[in-house]
């Protein structure tokens, strides 16, 4: 059939969780308002980046039992990280290449740097303990044993037919399985 078989447990193929996906037709075409939607204007101004960060909050919750405060802090760190890469709500993501996006180790290094430089004398929206918990919770995914599934640039070539091999996922822990499936489904949604 001329398709490609991708064994996601091999670590050979990567879907970068931090590469924003298009979650709707409107977000696929940038920062457009849905004129037929009768919801408040604020809710109609959805960007691809803001939708993706909302997805990432669920993605990280699937991976670990993060508290609401930890998820909110991860969101702040993601905004800082994307800003460091010159990415914001006004960025035309269709003009960016895979190499233009941060990877998971970039997120970890940012959170770790914030943790190491934390100054209790200053006011913060988050605590030193929250940063420490995030570092501990993300370490395996970003730098440790499970980083081979999440830390890298998307390297799946576009093809007419892609078959994702997920059989090996059944032999892994529930959180890793759920997070990998979540990542695969986000990629598939973006390709439609």
Report each predicted region and the residues it spans.
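P-loop NTPase motor domains
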Residues: 1-10, 18-192
